[in-house]
Amino acid sequence: MAAPSEVAAAVLGEGDGGAFGSWLDGRLEALGVDRAVYAAYILGVLQEEEEEEKLDALQGILSAFLEEESLLDICKEIVERWSETRDVTTKVKKEDEVQAIATLIEKQAQIVVKPRVVSEEEKQRKAALLAQYADVTDEEDEADKKDDAGASTANVSSDRTLFRNTNVEDVLNARKLERDSLRDESQRKKEQDKLQREKDKLAKQERKEKEKKRTQKGERKR
């Protein structure tokens, strides 16, 4: 499984998401938070959590670094910035997908089936066969030619339609598999995020306990 930082880099590097990634890195650095580690965890929360749960999850991540008075406002700022970026990115991706399918259909419609080239030897063989069956009337021969032409046209049209529909279906299936893979990867990363948040909370609690002991020790000396 890819490391969280690699997953974050892959997602934040796409389209307008890159702008959000740059903004988030700068914001975390200004707050004194390790952006190389926590940008990935924050991204996982923004992608996977429900809207009403995003703020709580972000507060759980950043509470080890921020004062309680400013924690909520900063988390709201991150969520709002993410929502604005995702609205733009989603619109662009949908337009790109529609354009890709339209282009594929257009290309398939332009495919021209080359007519079969009949060699001189085949022509001679056909002429010999016709000579053996001289009782075949001109009317029957003309009717057969018309039937053959109609059947060929129908077959070519059917083949084109089938080829075009198959390719469009392949494109849609490939995109679905890609989305499923990203969703599974995000779910695994989300579980890692929760473990990391628990570690951060314990570390914060330990720091508070140590600070409390130092304060009490100083008071006893006085």
Curated annotation (Swiss-Prot):
- Is the keyword Repeat assigned to this protein? no
| Biased composition regions of type Basic and acidic residues, renumbered to the chain | 172-209
- For the region Disordered, give the residue spans: 136-222
PTM Phosphothreonine: list the residues: 137
Listed GO CC annotations: cytosol
Q: Where is the composition biased (Basic residues)?
A: 210-222
Q: Where is the composition biased (Polar residues)?
A: 152-168
Give the keywords, sorted: Coiled coil, Isopeptide bond, Phosphoprotein, Ubl conjugation
Q: Specify whether Nuclease is a keyword of the entry.
A: no
Q: Renumbered to this chain, where is the cross-link Glycyl lysine isopeptide (Lys-Gly) (interchain with G-Cter in SUMO1)?
A: 93
* InterPro entries cross-referenced by the UniProt entry: CCDC43
* Residue ranges the record marks as coiled coil: 119-143, 175-217
Record-linked PANTHER family: COILED-COIL DOMAIN-CONTAINING PROTEIN 43
Q: Which family does it belong to?
A: Belongs to the CCDC43 family.
Q: What is this protein called?
A: Coiled-coil domain-containing protein 43
Q: Which organism is it from?
A: Mus musculus (Mouse)
Taxonomic classification? Eukaryota, Metazoa, Chordata, Craniata, Vertebrata
